[in-house]
From Swiss-Prot:
Function summary: Catalyzes the NADPH-dependent reduction of 7-cyano-7-deazaguanine (preQ0) to 7-aminomethyl-7-deazaguanine (preQ1).
The UniProt record lists the keyword Oxidoreductase: yes
Name of the protein in question: NADPH-dependent 7-cyano-7-deazaguanine reductase
Annotated family: Belongs to the GTP cyclohydrolase I family. QueF type 1 subfamily.
Lineage of producing organism: Bacteria, Pseudomonadati, Pseudomonadota, Alphaproteobacteria, Rhodospirillales
Keyword field: Cytoplasm, NADP, Oxidoreductase, Queuosine biosynthesis
SUPFAM superfamilies: Tetrahydrobiopterin biosynthesis enzymes-like
EC number(s) recorded for this UniProt protein: 1.7.1.13
InterPro entries named in the record: GTP-CH-I_C/QueF (IPR043133), NADPH_dep_7-cyano-7-deazaG_red (IPR050084), QueF (IPR029500), QueF_type1 (IPR016856)
Catalytic reaction list: 7-aminomethyl-7-carbaguanine + 2 NADP(+) = 7-cyano-7-deazaguanine + 2 NADPH + 3 H(+)
Annotated compartments: Cytoplasm
A Pfam family: QueF
């Protein structure tokens, strides 16, 4: 009897970092609790991309929360997908929303939200927030736990 993971191509394999987000493959596994309302959180505290104009590096902490339906995002494929932005030029808003939309397309969750907490460039931090809609009633939704940027406090 299979586990529903036979199709995975990255987990358990030596896998090179994709050249770009477009080339990255997000894989999913079956949700073992499809009738249960629960939250999955991924935190990427060292996300990087490039400014599309200057080529300078941009850094963010991403917090991704989703309520799965039939599938879960396989975490190694997510790690590789996020890493593929390292040499990708895009503005903060584009990176954050593109990540969320790719996740929605990959696993069709009941609900998803993303917080992109970008570190200052030119003295201005940019925080980007997006969600698919209102959170399902009864979903335990903890605060994302990222304090607003305070500079020297």
């Amino acid at each position: 009897m299979g586990t529903g993971t036979e199709h995975l191509t990255q987990l358990g394999q030596s896998t090179a970092l994709p050249a770009s987000p477009d080339k990255a493959v997000l894989e999913t596994v079956p949700n073992p609790h499809p009738g249960t309302l629960y939250l999955v959180r991924f935190t990427a505290p060292e996300f990087t991309s490039l400014c599309p104009i200057t080529g300078q590096p941009d850094f963010a902490q991403l917090v991704i929360d989703y309520a799965p339906e039939g599938s879960l995002v396989e975490s190694k494929s997510l790690k590789l997908f996020l890493g593929s932005f390292r040499n990708h030029g895009a503005f903060h808003e584009d990176c954050t929303i593109a990540i969320a939309k790719r996740l929605v397309a990959a696993c069709a969750p009941k609900w998803l939200r993303i917080g992109g907490y970008w570190y200052p460039r030119g003295g201005i931090p940019i925080d980007v927030f997006w969600q698919t809609g209102p959170a399902p009633e009864g979903l335990w939704l903890p605060d994302q736990g990222v304090a607003g940027y305070r500079g020297r406090g």
